[in-house]
Swiss-Prot record:
InterPro entries documented for this protein: GmhA/DiaA, Phosphoheptose_Isoase, SIS_dom, SIS_dom_sf, SIS_GmhA/DiaA_subfam
Annotated substrate binding sites: 52-54, 65, 93-94, 119-121, 124, 172
Main location: cytoplasm
Native source organism of the sequence: Photorhabdus laumondii subsp. laumondii (strain DSM 15139 / CIP 105565 / TT01)
Name this protein carries in UniProt: Phosphoheptose isomerase
PROSITE patterns, A to Z: SIS
Coiled-coil parts of chain: none
Misc. comment: The reaction produces a racemic mixture of D-glycero-alpha-D-manno-heptose 7-phosphate and D-glycero-beta-D-manno-heptose 7-phosphate.
GO MF, any single term: D-sedoheptulose 7-phosphate isomerase activity
Localization per record: Cytoplasm
Amino acid sequence: MYQDLIRSELNEAADTLAKFLSDDANIEAIQKAAVLLADSFKVGGKVLSCGNGGSHCDAMHFAEELTGRYRENRPGYPAIAISDVSHLSCVSNDFGYEFVFSRYIEAVGKEGDVLLGISTSGNSGNIIKAVEAARLKGMKVITLTGKDGGKMAGTADVEIRVPHFGYADRIQEIHIKVIHILIQLIEKEMVKA
């Protein structure tokens, strides 16, 4: 009944991954991001992650597997997804939704910390404001974007961009794989500490 649609969806996902994988710059960016994160942890820094919608779930997933567990038993790593509902609703109401992440960074971010900002379009105003706030705090910035990087292109220390111009879910599928690889590489880097 739906077998052709299922095959088509899986083939499109595989094609998106193959295109991403064929660009060595993507592989190098993932490695650079993992080392940057591990270096922050080694000196007492933390990572703050944020996104909207499905990207918000990815930001939470990233923090959960750093503080909890990925594949190996190891110490938890300092990671916070900016996802406290009382904070999000307070700042949205009092300042505007575009400030929900930047306000949190103003409060708890510090030099030596890292921001992971996730936006499939690269145009999310509240993620752009988060990047700006992180810069003012002296933090390093990693972004996961899609398409052409949008307004976030060129704003990060490391940008990992999925060059897909269709639906956002294809970009998110690569983002979650990148997140898992980042955690795996961080675990390897932290063993060296």
